[in-house]
Regions:
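Regulatory and interdomain segments flanking nucleotide-handling catalytic cores
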Residues: 1-134
């Protein structure tokens, strides 16, 4: 069984326009700082973050609770102007966990609306984890 959390920057496109016409360096620096903070926050909880796209990340989050996710969201909120949504999925394998997270967000299945956290949680860490490779 695997629990997977997908993190996506909300309002990324419109936000990039606020940086002006010469913004690529600003975007690159923001993305690297955000990735660093995500990796730092999740690794403290024994998880690993992967970059999916410039505005999307995913993490294997077996054992993380809703409160753990909220704590990370609070850390991010205090550090960045941009916001992230989190979609948590749970399944027999990474593919099923990804589908579960996607469906939860698509159907607006909130676990915590204030911090934009959608999904399904297991919260157990005793299961072995299968890592997916993109």
């Amino acid at each position: 069984m695997i629990q997977l959390t997908i993190m996506k920057i909300t309002g990324y496109g419109p936000w990039t326009l606020t940086l002006g016409s010469d913004r690529e360096h600003e975007l690159q620096m923001l993305q690297s700082r955000l990735y660093h903070k995500l990796q730092e926050s999740f690794s403290k909880k024994n998880c690993l973050v992967f970059l999916n796209r410039s505005d999307e990340y995913f993490s294997v989050t077996n054992g993380l609770t809703l409160d753990d996710h909220i704590t990370i969201q609070k850390e991010l909120e205090s550090s960045f102007d941009v916001k992230l949504s989190m979609s948590i999925g749970y399944g027999e394998n990474p593919y099923d966990a990804n589908l579960d997270a996607y469906e939860a967000k698509k159907s607006q299945k909130f676990l915590n609306e204030q911090y934009s956290i959608f999904g399904t949680l297991n919260g157990h860490s005793e299961h072995s984890v299968t890592i997916m490779h993109l």
